């Protein structure tokens, strides 16, 4: 088993990540993310059923989720609970490295009607903190121990000595125990209101992903999310810190970057396919978000 170098995150129309982490028999993935290799320079909005810990190795990062932005420095760790919509990007574009550890919680907990799941997993997964941050220092309770366990997992995952599957499972269980003990100090557990916001957000994003190349109104988007225009805008601001229009623009630009890199379509065609009203409008928006024109972007690939 090898540590994988990732360079993109593939998602479906609901922003659920489509990649399988590890294997059916051993659902654990360990990735070294070097952001100089990433196609868009960052990890875009996504969610997954697995647990994730990101461990910052080099550079500084911003992790956005549910209305929060967490500034992460080398040696710091962030735990992201299952089902949480998040994205992460380096403060300095294209510079930074982190390890991502992603695993299926049922791999550790066993059956949902078993004692281990009910005692140590059910509350944390269903109503526990959406994220936790720890510093890998002796002064940070739990942080140093989690960092040591993650370092051991990287070595086991890449070198696979005898019994390494069992050793990794034991280390992940120790990490989970430490996270449970931190949980009492963690902010923002899941509430019915946040659960409702998350469902509306995913419905709206699903529609945007399926129709970003078309023109549609805010009213239509709100209908798809089963709410009103004003409430949808408040939901986006609470959860993502931006209005729906801004999220749609970012997504259109992301898709345009992919087409500019991976297709022979003209710039006018890329503009049309990604929902821009004209090539000039596309060019000005692309310059604002990416820092260069579409033509310059393609030339520098």
Regions found by a protein language model. Give the residues of each.
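Short, conserved beta-strand element in jelly-roll/cupin
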Residues: 46-63, 79
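Histidine-centered divalent metal-coordination motifs
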Residues: 46-48, 86, 281
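Conserved short histidine dyad/triad with adjacent acidic residue
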Residues: 30-48
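Short acidic-glycine-tyrosine-enriched beta hairpin
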Residues: 67-81
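A hydrophobic/aromatic-rich effector-binding and dimerization subdomain
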Residues: 2-34, 82-155
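An amphipathic alpha-helical interaction segment
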Residues: 126-191, 196-199, 203
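Basic/polar phosphate-binding segments, predominantly the helix-turn-helix DNA-binding elements
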Residues: 177-185, 203-254, 265, 269-300
């Amino acid at each position: 088993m090898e540590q994988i170098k990732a360079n993109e995150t593939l998602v479906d129309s609901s922003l659920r990540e489509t990649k399988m982490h590890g294997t059916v028999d051993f659902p654990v993935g360990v990735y070294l993310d070097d952001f100089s290799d990433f196609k868009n320079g960052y990890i875009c909005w996504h969610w997954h059923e697995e647990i994730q810990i990101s461990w910052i190795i080099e550079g500084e990062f911003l992790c956005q989720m549910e209305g929060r932005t967490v500034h992460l420095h080398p040696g710091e760790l962030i735990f992201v609970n299952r089902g949480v919509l998040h994205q992460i990007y380096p403060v300095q574009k294209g510079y930074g490295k982190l390890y991502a550890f992603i695993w299926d919680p049922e791999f550790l907990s066993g059956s949902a009607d078993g004692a281990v799941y009910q005692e140590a997993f059910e509350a944390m997964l269903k109503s526990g903190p959406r994220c936790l941050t720890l510093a890998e220092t002796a002064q940070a309770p739990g942080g140093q121990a989690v960092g040591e366990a993650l370092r051991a997992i990287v070595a086991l995952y890449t070198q696979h000595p005898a019994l390494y599957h069992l050793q990794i499972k034991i280390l992940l269980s120790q990490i989970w125990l430490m996270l449970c003990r931190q949980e009492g100090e963690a902010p923002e557990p899941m509430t019915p209101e946040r659960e409702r916001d998350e469902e509306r957000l995913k419905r709206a994003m699903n529609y945007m992903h399926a129709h970003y190349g078309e023109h549609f109104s805010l009213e239509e988007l709100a209908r798809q999310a089963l709410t009103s225009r004003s409430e949808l805008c408040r939901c986006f601001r609470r959860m993502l810190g931006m209005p729906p229009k801004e999220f749609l623009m970012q997504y259109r630009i992301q898709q345009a970057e992919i087409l500019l890199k991976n297709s022979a379509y003209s710039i006018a065609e890329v503009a049309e396919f990604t929902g821009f009203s004209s090539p000039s409008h596309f060019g000005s928006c692309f310059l604002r978000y990416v820092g260069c024109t579409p033509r310059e972007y393609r030339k520098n690939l």
